[in-house]
């Protein structure tokens, strides 16, 4: 336990709203909405869970004011008002306020005017034809509009480099009017606030990089921000009862001093714009990373890519210039970090995005001093899901995304539970079983907890993953869980309990080729554990997640590396936000990548393999090396159940299912313990 927070829990007035604390959930694309864009059961359960956890202000991300193929929530017609009223009611029930982040998705493409305008133009022509009684033209134009709209998903999210005509002033007015109309509907639904999405279309107009217009919306700084201020004014006129917030995207700075993000405003311009926003009646400003185009890792960086709170310096500058509350967002992962930001006066409100997905009870725990489950910034369940058009979830939180149906059940009487294995699956099983009121003992054969997580934390930028283990080390004693290290569990140990969960993990494997028993062959696990110190030139067999991360580890320790992979690319399955960092590292160190290549033998000189060429032929390959590292997967460990008389459930890698990742380990353990 730590000391309860004080600053984070102080109320704050934002425009017409009184927020009960300084903790907000910023806008995130979730994928939870229904196909028609309405707020369904999954969305309601997710946002209500955040409110129940004590968050004071929740922003619903990417709400479209028009019907579109873009997979986002939509408030485009009066018929959609009831679902948003249900959302407002669910959040208000727990004392929180809710905002909608409005943006126009059919125009979410790089550059000013790089927008799909055909659907709107065709729909307008269709309505004109209908008014004139021309049913044939009406049908043809509606078909054309629908066809373009159906293609919008691909155009907006997969083919981000196409160029279309610059938007006309009339079209910009139509967009502004649609946003204002949606704000008016939000007011009718009982929503508390509107957040103007200052990136995307609005941000591209503000950007000196992207805005090449020569009319009243281009050229000078005043012209470039004109449209954004007009949108703010239109919202305030259409929904005068609502608080209006502006998300201010800024080009930040990478650790090496280079600009980070495409589009957006430079810091000096952002500060000037903040003063104009205050003059226009904005009630709150959220300073964020700009990323009008490109990899989402620019906006939501993975572990190790950026310092904690990297947007804070600009937020602090903005706060010094305006009197309205300023929020900061970006890798604030702990209660202590949020407290310090507020104590230093650098911001007024702390946005915990991924962190609240990981632990929705941050506010409640801040009041008691209970440790929170800190986000790893791995991006595996959240950002990667967004980029792959799936609904988001947190790898550490088995309930996230399924709040409507998944929760820890009350226990069924007094039970003793034996958990065999102190890796991540065993620790999660112990937590859930203890939360249900059971008497839990964890048996770990080694002298430490964490299992394969300890290995996963060894490569460059990956040390943050150890926070997942540290969380359990903090909370399990308070839940009454007994942990016995250096204790290989026996049948007697299990039989002393009422039920057992076995989470003994897996072991690495070796490809059985000639020479595989050579002293020059070592396992990736031994390398990452520090048991094998290699020098010189190393061939890593296997270019999957473990192989590429082991290669990075070896580069960090001064080795030359060649990777041999059977598939046609390396790092298959790696986070799309982490992959560019790996490939940059490999390019810098001239890592050889032998893809579509199968190991056949290990010799004194190195390795021999067969490569499949582009035309399907096979050719021999010889790669000279001093050491060979096997990184070709793992096989489930077996636990001797001879003599065990109590019910046993296997979870994680030893379950026989191909889990091999932290999310699967957590979820199999959670559900197994929840069914005891």
Where are these regions (language model features)?
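Conserved beta-strand termini and adjacent loop/short-helix elements that scaffold enzyme active sites
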Residues: 329, 397, 486-488, 524, ...
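Flavin-dependent oxidoreductase catalytic cores
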Residues: 1-420, 424, 428-435, 439-440, ...
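Short, structured coil segments at secondary-structure junctions
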Residues: 322, 345-346, 479, 517, ...
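SH3/SH3-like beta-barrel fold
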Residues: 607-611
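Rossmann-like dinucleotide-binding cores of NAD(P)H-dependent redox enzymes
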Residues: 439-479, 551-599, 655-658
């Amino acid at each position: 336990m730590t000391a309860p927070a004080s600053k984070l829990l102080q109320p704050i007035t934002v425009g017409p709203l009184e927020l009960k604390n300084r903790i907000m959930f910023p806008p995130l694309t979730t994928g939870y909405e229904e196909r028609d864009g309405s707020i369904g059961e999954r969305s309601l359960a997710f946002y209500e869970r955040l409110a129940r956890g004590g968050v004071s202000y929740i922003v619903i991300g990417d709400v479209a004011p028009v019907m579109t193929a873009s997979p986002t929530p939509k408030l485009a017609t009066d018929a959609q008002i009831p679902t948003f009223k249900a959302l407002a009611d669910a959040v208000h029930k727990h004392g929180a306020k809710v905002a909608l982040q409005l943006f126009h998705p059919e125009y979410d493409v790089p550059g000013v005017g790089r927008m799909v305008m055909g659907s709107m133009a065709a729909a307008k022509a269709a309505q004109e034809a209908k008014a004139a009684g021309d049913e044939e033209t009406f049908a043809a134009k509606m078909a054309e509009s629908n066809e373009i709209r159906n293609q919008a998903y691909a155009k907006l999210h997969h083919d981000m480099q196409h160029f279309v005509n610059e938007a006309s002033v009339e079209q910009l007015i139509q967009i502004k009017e649609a946003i204002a109309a949606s704000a008016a509907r939000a007011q009718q639904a009982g929503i508390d606030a509107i957040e103007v999405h200052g990136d995307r279309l609005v941000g591209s107009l503000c950007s000196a990089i992207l805005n090449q217009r020569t009319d009243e919306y281009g050229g000078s700084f005043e012209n470039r921000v004109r449209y954004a201020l007009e949108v703010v004014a239109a919202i305030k006129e259409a929904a005068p009862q609502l608080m209006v917030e502006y998300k201010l995207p800024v080009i930040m700075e990478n650790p090496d001093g280079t600009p980070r993000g495409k589009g957006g405003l430079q810091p000096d311009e952002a500060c000037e714009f903040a003063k104009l926003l205050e003059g226009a009646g904005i009630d709150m400003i959220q300073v964020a990373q700009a990323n009008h185009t490109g990899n989402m890792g620019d906006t939501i960086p993975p572990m190790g890519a950026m310092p904690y709170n990297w947007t804070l310096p600009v937020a602090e500058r903005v706060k010094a210039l305006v009197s309205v509350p300023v929020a900061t967002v970006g890798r604030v992962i702990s209660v202590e970090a949020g407290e310090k930001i507020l104590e230093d006066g650098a911001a007024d409100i702390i946005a915990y995005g991924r962190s609240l997905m990981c632990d929705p009870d941050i506010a409640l725990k801040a009041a008691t001093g209970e440790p929170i489950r800190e986000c790893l910034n791995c991006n595996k369940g959240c950002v990667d899901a967004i980029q792959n058009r799936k609904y988001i979830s947190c790898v550490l939180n088995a309930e996230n995304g399924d709040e409507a149906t998944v929760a820890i059940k009350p226990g069924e009487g007094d039970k003793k539970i034996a958990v065999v294995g102190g890796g991540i699956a065993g620790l999660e099983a112990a937590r859930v079983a203890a939360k249900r009121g059971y008497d839990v003992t964890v048996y770990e054969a080694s002298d430490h907890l964490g299992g394969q997580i300890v290995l996963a934390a060894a490569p460059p930028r990956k040390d943050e993953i150890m926070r997942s283990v540290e969380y359990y080390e903090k909370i399990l004693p308070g839940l009454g869980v007994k942990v016995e290290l250096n204790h290989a569990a026996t049948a007697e140990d299990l039989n002393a309990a009422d039920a057992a969960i076995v989470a003994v993990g897996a072991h690495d494997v070796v490809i059985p080729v000639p020479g595989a028993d050579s002293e020059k062959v070592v396992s990736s696990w031994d390398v990452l554990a520090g048991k094998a110190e290699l020098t010189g030139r190393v061939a890593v067999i296997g270019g999957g997640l473990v192989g590429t991360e082991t290669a990075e580890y070896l580069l960090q320790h001064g080795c030359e590396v060649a990777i041999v992979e059977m598939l046609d690319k390396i790092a298959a399955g790696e986070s799309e936000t982490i992959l560019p960092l790996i490939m940059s590292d490999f390019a810098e160190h001239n890592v050889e990548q032998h893809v579509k290549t199968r190991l056949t033998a290990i010799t004194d000189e190195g390795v021999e393999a067969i490569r499949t060429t582009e035309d399907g032929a096979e050719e021999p390959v010889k790669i000279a090396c001093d050491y060979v590292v096997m990184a070709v997967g793992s096989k489930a460990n077996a636990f001797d159940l001879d003599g065990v008389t109590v019910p046993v459930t296997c979870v994680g890698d030893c379950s026989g299912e191909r889990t091999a990742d932290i999310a699967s380990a957590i979820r199999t353990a959670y559900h197994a313990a929840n069914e005891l």
